[in-house]
């Protein structure tokens, strides 16, 4: 089974939950558990998730708060099954959406077996890292400090390393350095995580790499292109609703609505003569075709919903709610 087909089979697994699901019995020494990936915005949590599972299931961009939903990535080896939970970056919220994202990230800390606290190894430990560290000391969940972006460290990185050594020593956390971008030292990270897991069952079929349905990932791939192609004022005000997915033997038809808060943002997304919307659609279509390993017809619409990020009702309609 190809990587693309592993993701494309998600809906089949989910739709069969009411019946029998093919989950084998784990051997006696098998380990399994849930690992929460926690950290400030833009420290590389989603890039790490994609590297660990071996394919793209989480979108990435230079824009803070790219991740909005708790996304699970599943890594299964002969010895263990690791379920990684990628969470929104923890920050001070400024609206209802921000509050939902941060609450979900905090809930993840209490609902996992191990916390992987990811920091940016290209810069010294800062106030945002210490804020998260203070949250973690109130949790009984074991914590591993993961220092990412070692490939981007300056030649003289001694002070950077010392700042994280002090943090790890203060809280008595084991530490591992790696690069999510290049994959360097990720086997060592995975080995350390397995050491902290208990013996347990398969939670998911061994060939599954995420528990999210295709429609969710399609929406995220569209949002990713908006983050990459539009100016700073638009990305945080965007939500995607997948209105239709219609499969035929030759092509999959996808209709999606892009929700924004202001008419000016709608104008930016459409662009002169529809040029921006065309660019977004073309780039998103390519990514969705990789996801499902087939041809896609993608049609995008833009709708203004004033202050949707500040309305609990609107947030719920668009799929954003505090997770249990």
Curated annotation (Swiss-Prot):
Residues 86-89 are annotated as: G3. Residues 178-180 are annotated as: G5. Residues 148-151 are annotated as: G4. GTP binds at residues 39-46, 86-90, 148-151. Residues 230-306 form the KH type-2 domain. Pfam families: KH_2 (PF07650), MMR_HSR1 (PF01926). An essential GTPase that binds both GDP and GTP, with rapid nucleotide exchange. Plays a role in 16S rRNA processing and 30S ribosomal subunit biogenesis and possibly also in cell cycle regulation and energy metabolism. This is GTPase Era. The gene is era.
């Amino acid at each position: 089974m190809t990587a693309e087909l592993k993701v494309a089979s998600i809906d089949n697994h989910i739709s069969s939950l009411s019946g029998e699901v093919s989950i084998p019995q784990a051997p006696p020494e098998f380990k399994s558990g849930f690992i929460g990936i926690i950290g400030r915005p833009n420290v590389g949590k989603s890039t790490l998730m994609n590297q660990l599972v071996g394919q793209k299931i989480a979108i990435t961009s230079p824009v803070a708060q790219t991740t909005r939903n708790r996304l699970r990535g599943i890594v299964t080896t002969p010895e263990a099954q690791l379920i990684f939970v990628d969470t929104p970056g923890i920050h001070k919220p400024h609206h209802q959406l921000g509050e939902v994202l941060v609450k979900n990230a905090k809930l993840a800390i209490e609902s996992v077996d191990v916390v992987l606290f990811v920091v940016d190894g290209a810069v010294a430990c800062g106030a945002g890292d210490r804020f998260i560290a203070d949250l973690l000391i109130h949790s009984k969940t074991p914590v591993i400090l993961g220092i990412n972006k070692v490939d981007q460290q300056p030649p003289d990185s001694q002070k950077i390393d010392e700042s994280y050594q002090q943090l790890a020593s203060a809280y008595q956390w084991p530490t591992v350095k790696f690069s999510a971008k290049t994959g360097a030292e990720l086997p060592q990270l995975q080995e350390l995580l397995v050491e902290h897991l208990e013996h347990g069952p398969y939670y998911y079929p061994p060939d599954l790499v995420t528990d999210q349905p295709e429609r969710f990932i399609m929406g995220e791939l569209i949002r990713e292109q908006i983050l990459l192609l539009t100016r700073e004022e638009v990305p945080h005000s965007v939500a995607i609703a997948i209105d239709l997915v219609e499969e035929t033997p030759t092509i999959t038809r996808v209709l999606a609505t892009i929700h924004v808060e202001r008419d000016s943002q709608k104008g930016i997304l459409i662009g002169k003569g529809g040029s921006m919307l065309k660019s977004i659609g073309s780039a998103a279509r390519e990514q969705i075709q990789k996801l499902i390993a087939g041809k896609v017809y993608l049609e995008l619409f833009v709708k203004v919903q004033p202050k949707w990020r500040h309305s609990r009702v609107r947030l719920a309609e668009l799929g954003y709610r505090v997770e249990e």
